[in-house]
Amino acid sequence: MPFITARDGAQLYWRDFGQGAPILFLNGLGCSSQMWDYQIAAFADQGFRCIGFDRRGHGRSDQPAGGYDLDTFTDDVATLIDELGLASLTLVTHSMGGGEAVRYLTRHGSERVSRLILLAPTTPMLLKSDDNPGGAPRAGFEALWAQWRRDYPKWVADNIAPFFIPE
């Protein structure tokens, strides 16, 4: 199985199908790259190179104790793009993957990315502020972040059902 090594030593899983112009699929929170199986098969059959990536704490990637912040996630994406030598890349994203892609572009530039597709992306601002009075209070985010730092894989396991299992 193909893995890359992140800057902090975490082993991050990726899958590669087809040949041609590259498409990198970034999944939503709590999902693995397998969520893209149907899309990967269809695009690979149409002559594209399709790469699925399991972010840290997801799928077959390591579940390290730390590194569950947006900058680390996007640095992991940058490591994958660099290691695979990807250029003229199309990023296809879902939910949190959209936030990763936008942060990637602001941190690492757009030289290697030619297209960005955002599917049901996370909103750019969830925190309550003067500019976003309908947002959530900071205390809620701080409690969530503390849980993530303590044991992100456990948080995902405990909270994934509402996303996929109807009541």
Language-model features: locations:
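Conserved alpha/beta-hydrolase "nucleophile elbow" surrounding the catalytic nucleophile
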Residues: 27-29, 89, 93-95
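Catalytic nucleophile serine of serine hydrolases
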Residues: 54, 61, 95-96, 120
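Residue in the alpha/beta-hydrolase core beta-strand immediately N-terminal to the catalytic nucleophile
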Residues: 54, 90, 114-117
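Flexible "cap/lid" loop of the alpha/beta hydrolase fold
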Residues: 99-150
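Helix-loop "lid/cap" segments that line or gate small-molecule binding pockets
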Residues: 143-147, 157-167
